[in-house]
């Protein structure tokens, strides 16, 4: 008879892992890094942009290389079958309109990208302070081309070199990671308005290695990154998403609702929405028209699909063509915030989007493109939109313009805000007051907090973090 060997057990970390939380808070409180001053980062980004050859040009769909409109479906696909496709989506909401649109039923083009990409940031301690390795990365859709991205930002097609390009630098730290060095590892969804069930693996991995420092990389503290988040179009969407998942310590462990109550409310929101979603051929999408250079809504609202030719001398592949999605106008993304019994709370909405895996995710108080509602009476516009747009400067606690993921979106930008709320606000159905700490806890699990809320959460957490016993 063979003997059974009992495996050794490992200690289970509590939800608030104080070692990491204290080190993260110290990094957030440190605004002097070992490599460069925060005020020099923008000049360094500009220098990296000037040191390389970057060019993005809009082209007709007919000039796309390796992309074509499939004969039967009309879907816009890559000949390799990899990367992503532009398809159609048919959404029916049986319980009322939600998301970024006033209608109970609609059809639209959508980006379908089944591959799970890696968004990985490498962390290392210098002089007792955690620093994070950021990359000055060119993306064709960035309004200013180069922004600070994660150490690794790559689809499976990229890091397996389906494009025939060079290796993705430092991918070995993330695929697979050393389990003893993982700080963050969670699948998070991307924009449910434009993607169909798209997720990326958000990761932060610590190292003690001597990591090569290429010209397009720099080590920054969390405090430096927090300062840069106050500047327009500097920290890219993927970096913001990953950093929002950091396990900050809850320094005010009280809230209007307990964690169990919050999860019960959220589960009820997911359960009560009856949303039917199915993929359809792009050629069958109603209400949209396709021309030689654009696919657009017949009323000029929402977004467009177009094509670009790209050159990027420091990319794994130095030239290529691809489709991109372009929004029709500047978006608005805002949290209303108030103190309840001295504890800051933000007003979240349980938002329905056709592209979400689980129908509903927690979103900012307001998340929309106002132009899409300009033709509607006030009562049909999103709740709190007018309040946010007309907020006096004295109530605005945070404001910056951030662009969305430049690998799929062309110049898509939103005005991100945190605004002091009127104490008398009573949340309507589908809205709830929660603490930033409760949202942070939920980012440890996928498909709870949407990507727009994660951006604002990253800004709020970095500004508020303090080491235990700190000032």
Curated annotation (Swiss-Prot):
This protein's source sits in the domain of life called Bacteria
InterPro entries to which the protein is assigned, alphabetical? EvaA-like (IPR005212), EvaA-like_sf (IPR038153)
Which transformation does this protein catalyse, written as a reaction? dTDP-4-dehydro-6-deoxy-alpha-D-glucose = dTDP-3,4-didehydro-2,6-dideoxy-alpha-D-glucose + H2O
Phenotypic consequence of residue 405 to A/Q: Loss of dehydratase activity
Identify the residues that bind dTDP-4-dehydro-6-deoxy-alpha-D-glucose 1. 67, 155-159, 238, 405-408
Note the effect listed for residue 139 to Q. Answer: Loss of dehydratase activity
Q: Which UniProt keywords apply?
A: Antibiotic biosynthesis, Disulfide bond, Lyase
Function per UniProt = Involved in the biosynthesis of the 2,3,6-trideoxysugar L-epivancosamine, the terminal sugar added to the aglycone scaffold of chloroeremomycin, a member of the glycopeptide antibiotics vancomycin family.
The UniProt record's further free-text remark is:
Two binding sites (pockets A and B) for the dTDP-sugar ligands have been identified in each subunit. It seems that pocket A represents the active site and pocket B is a vestige of the gene duplication event.
Which proteins does it associate with, and in what oligomeric form?
A: Homodimer.
Its protein name is dTDP-4-dehydro-6-deoxy-alpha-D-glucopyranose 2,3-dehydratase
Q: Which organism is it from?
A: Amycolatopsis orientalis (Nocardia orientalis)
Output the lineage of the source organism. Answer: Bacteria, Bacillati, Actinomycetota, Actinomycetes, Pseudonocardiales
């Amino acid at each position: 008879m063979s003997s059974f060997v009992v495996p050794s057990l490992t200690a289970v970390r509590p939800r608030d892992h104080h070692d990491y939380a204290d080190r993260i808070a110290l990094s957030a409180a440190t605004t002097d890094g070992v490599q460069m001053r925060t005020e020099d980062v923008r000049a360094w980004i500009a220098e990296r942009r000037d040191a390389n050859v970057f060019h993005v040009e809009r082209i007709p769909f007919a000039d796309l290389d390796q992309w074509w409109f499939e004969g039967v479906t009309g879907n816009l696909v890559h000949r390799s079958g990899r990367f992503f496709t532009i398809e159609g989506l048919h959404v029916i909401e049986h319980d009322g309109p939600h998301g970024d649109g006033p209608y109970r039923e609609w059809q639209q083009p959508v980006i379908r990208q089944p591959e799970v990409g890696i968004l990985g940031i490498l962390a290392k301690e210098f002089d007792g302070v955690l620093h994070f390795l950021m990359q000055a990365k060119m993306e064709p859709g960035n309004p200013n081309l180069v922004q600070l991205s994660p150490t690794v930002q790559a689809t499976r097609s990229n890091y397996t070199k389906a494009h025939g390009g060079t290796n993705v630098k430092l991918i070995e730290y993330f695929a697979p990671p050393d389990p003893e060095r993982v700080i963050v590892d969670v699948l998070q969804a991307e924009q449910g308005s434009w993607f169909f069930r798209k997720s990326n693996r958000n990761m932060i991995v610590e190292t003690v290695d001597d990591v090569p420092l290429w010209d397009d990389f720099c080590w920054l503290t969390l405090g430096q990154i927090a300062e840069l988040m106050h500047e327009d179009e500097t920290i890219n969407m993927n970096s913001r998403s990953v950093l929002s998942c950091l396990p900050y310590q809850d320094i005010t462990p009280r809230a209007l609702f307990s964690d169990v109550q919050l999860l019960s409310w959220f589960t009820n929101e997911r359960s009560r929405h009856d949303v039917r979603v199915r993929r359809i051929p792009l050629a069958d999408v109603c209400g949209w028209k396709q021309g030689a250079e654009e696919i657009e809504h017949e009323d000029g609202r929402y977004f467009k699909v177009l094509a670009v030719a790209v050159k990027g001398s420091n990319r794994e592949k130095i030239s290529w063509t691809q489709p991109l999605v372009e929004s029709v106008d500047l978006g608005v993304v805002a949290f209303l915030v108030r103190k309840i019994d001295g504890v800051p709370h933000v007003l979240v909405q349980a938002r329905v989007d056709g592209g979400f895996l689980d129908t509903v995710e927690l979103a900012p108080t307001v998340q929309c493109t106002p132009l899409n509602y300009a033709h509607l009476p006030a009562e049909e516009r999103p709740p709190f939109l007018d309040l946010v747009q007309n907020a006096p400067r004295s109530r605005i606690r945070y404001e910056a313009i951030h662009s969305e993921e430049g690998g799929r979106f062309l110049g898509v930008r939103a005005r991100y805000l945190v605004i002091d709320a009127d104490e008398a606000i009573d949340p309507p159905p589908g809205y709830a007051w929660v603490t930033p700490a409760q949202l942070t806890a939920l980012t440890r699990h996928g498909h709870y907090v949407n990507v727009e809320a994660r951006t604002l959460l990253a800004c709020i957490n970095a500004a508020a973090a303090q080491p235990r016993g700190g000032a």
